[in-house]
Amino acid sequence: MQTWTDEGEEIPLTGGDVTEGLVRLGDTVRRPRGERWELVRAVLTHLESVGFEGAPRFLGVDSAGREVLSYIDGEVAGRPRPPWIADEDRMISVARLLRAYDDAVAGFGIPSDLPPPIEPPGLPELDDPPELVGHQDITPENVVFRDGRAFALIDFDLARPVSRAREVVNLLLWWAPLGADEDLDPELRGLDRPRRCRHIADAYGLSRPDRLRVMELAIALNERAWHLMKYRAETLGGGWQRMWDEGVGDKIKSRQTWLEENADSITTALTS
């Protein structure tokens, strides 16, 4: 077990869109406990027990009540995006890392005592039985690279019971990526999205039944995303409100149109 101390200089870290108060202290990361921090602790403890190296170690809770995690050295694709963000070999390595994570976490099961998710009125229903506790936030900021390959996943705040197909939808969203060029980072525009989706599905090892339904699932999840983002902005504020004010709702609706227009070509690429 890695030892740690509360002494030393705290260095602020750039988190994702909604994580605030993230700091590095020595060889550890301190982060405020989220609403599902106990699930995160249990998942990270399980991953350590099965020898999965691609995630932080949960070390405890400090005197300020923050989670203490091991710091994983490497590079992440913050903003502005680095030129290598569109590199297909890196993209494929992310898919392989996610598959390794999903295989490792599958033995953890799905806890029976998890509180039901808080869902806003009018949220479209989703028929997609969960298989494992997925990461569900495979953004460029949450993948640590070493020597040009994805080494570890960080930030498990959105971990929840999902299907493998839903994990791949999240992966495609950020790394294909899914959406109209004008809504993407400049470094990710003009790419052959159907081909990249196929590479991701192949690297992950997505089953044929899941390949046939993954775009239908992406459309359904994107529709739900608009309702969830609006609800979180209204009830949680903070980073959620900032993203909503910056137009994320409009981008989600634009992506919905793009998904519907491109679903057939991507499904063909995934299954041919």
Can you say where each PLM-predicted feature lies in the sequence?
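ATP-binding pocket architecture of kinase catalytic cores
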Residues: 9-135, 146-149
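Short, surface-exposed acidic
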Residues: 206-216
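Actinobacteria-biased recognition of intrinsically disordered, low-complexity terminal regions
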Residues: 1-18, 261-272
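ATP/Mg2+ or Mg2+-diphosphate-binding catalytic cores
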Residues: 225-272
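Amphipathic alpha-helical interface surfaces
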Residues: 97, 146, 164-167, 193-197, ...
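Short, polar/flexible loop-turn hinges at active-site or ligand-entry regions and domain interfaces
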Residues: 80-84, 160-162, 179-184
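Catalytic activation segment of kinase domains across protein kinase-like and atypical kinase folds
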Residues: 117, 122-128, 132, 139-178
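Active-site activation/catalytic loop segments of kinase-like enzymes and analogous catalytic loops
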Residues: 168-205, 221-235
